[in-house]
Amino acid sequence: MAVKKRAGAKKKEKKVIPVGKAFVQATFNNTIVTLTDLQGNVIAWASCGTAGFKGSRKGTPYAAQMAAQAAARKAAESGLRQVEVLVKGPGSGREAAIRSLQASGINVTAIRDVTPIPHNGCRPPKRRRV
C-alpha cells in the first residue's frame, strides 16, 4: 500500500499592503467597517453582527468599536499601517469606529464624510409616533 504524496502543495503567500482605505458605513441599526487597498480590493471587513451583537444592540457605539477592532486586527495581519477613513451614514457608530481604528495601531491620515445627500429624491419614511 503506497502512500500518495501531494505534488505542488504551496503555502499561499500574503501580500503586504501598508496603505489603504477604511470605509465606515454607519446606519441607525448597524455599522459595517471595510478595509481595502488603494484600488478597492477588500483586505478585511467586520460588522456589529459579526462582532457578536444582535438586534438593537448592533446600533450602539460600543458595537461599532468592537467591529472596527475586529476589522483592524484582521487587516494588521496583511500589514496595513495607514488608512484614509471614508464615513457614510447618520448612525451612532461613526466616531466610535474611527477612534477604535486609531487606538488599534492604524495611522489615520484623513477622515472624509461621503454620506449621500439627496437633491430632493425619495420620500423619507413617516415620523414615528411612540
Swiss-Prot record:
Keyword Transcription: no
Annotated keywords: Ribonucleoprotein, Ribosomal protein, RNA-binding, rRNA-binding
GO biological process, one term: translation
An annotated Gene Ontology molecular function: rRNA binding
One Gene Ontology CC term in the entry: ribonucleoprotein complex
InterPro entries: Ribosomal_uS11, Ribosomal_uS11_bac-type, Ribosomal_uS11_CS, Ribosomal_uS11_sf
SUPFAM superfamilies listed in its UniProt record: Translational machinery components
Subunit annotation: Part of the 30S ribosomal subunit. Interacts with proteins S7 and S18. Binds to IF-3.
Function in brief: Located on the platform of the 30S subunit, it bridges several disparate RNA helices of the 16S rRNA. Forms part of the Shine-Dalgarno cleft in the 70S ribosome.
Protein's name in the database: Small ribosomal subunit protein uS11
